[in-house]
Amino acid sequence: MIRAYEQNPQHFIEDLENVRVEQLTGHGSSVLEELVQLVKDKNIDISIKYDPRKDSEVFANRVITDDIELLRKILAYFLPEDAILKGGHYDNQLQNGIKRVKEFLESSPNTQWELRAFMAVMHFSLTADRIDDDILKVIVDSMNHHGDARSKLREELAELTAELKIYSVIQAEINKHLSSSGTINIHDKSINLMDKNLYGYTDEEIFKASAEYKILEKMPQTTIQVDGSEKKIVSIKDFLGSENKRTGALGNLKNSYSYNKDNNELSHFATTSSDKSRPLNDLVSQKTTQLSDITSRFNSAIEALNRFIQKYDSVMQRLLDDTSGK
């Protein structure tokens, strides 16, 4: 017996791992391998995630599409057997359902799915001829809309947060010279903002895939001499003076700023740099709130779909029980 995915996705996955794919209803479906390949080609990630509002037992988050055999079992679990009578009513109903599944996988902007949501959408896409199409369409359209908006907001927030992180690195460097009452060179003796270690990265490839790197690679560069050879860096001046970022360019920059108790240009520079990033900080807070709201709406659509599934299954079970009791 395979426990229901709606109640505990961890138990559902454990049960699937303990059966052979040949034991599942859709193992012989003519479209099983096609759907497996479609999920892979669309880079769809299906994961189980602990939700304290739904799950009584804590379990580790897991991306289950990393395991192709497990993905095959998940698809075989909800796929029905092929119709024996080709061209009949059941066969037509089944083919229409499979067509909807394929269309959904190919057109949905969302590629990150929690198992409950994925199974719910697949189940209803496959069986839509037997339930209320209008209700299903409203719920799934809502999920797609909020899922797409959530993805775009996440990308925008990642870019904003990365730019803010670069400003924080610059501010830390300025503060270091302020505390020592020294001079900061922001040009040819500047720290290299392309240094991955400044942002907590240890792997160069991971850094090059980061939002910080994507911003920095659009900046002008300064050529410096290191051990007799030329090296290009992104200096503090390069970054602050560039238009190629959300906050725009900071004008009238000098190459260096010194501490002076009577006319403290270093302190003024620190304030100017901080003021430049303040609207960005406000925007990050605003976008974070928007993302939280969109995520809440997306989760509400998933919950509505799951409640609809449970109600539908409950009604069908009662009908089956009544029929078998006669």
UniProtKB/Swiss-Prot annotation:
UniProt lineage: Bacteria, Pseudomonadati, Pseudomonadota, Gammaproteobacteria, Enterobacterales
Gene: lcrV
Record key words, sorted: Plasmid, Secreted, Virulence
Domain of life per record: Bacteria
The species this protein was found in: Yersinia pestis bv. Antiqua (strain Angola)
Protein name, per record: Virulence-associated V antigen
Pfam assignment, any one: LcrV
Main function: Possibly involved in calcium regulation of YOP expression, which includes the export process.
GO cellular component: extracellular region
Keyword Secreted: yes
Subcellular location: Secreted
InterPro entries in the cross-refs: LowCa_resp_V_Ag, Vir_assoc_V_ag_sf
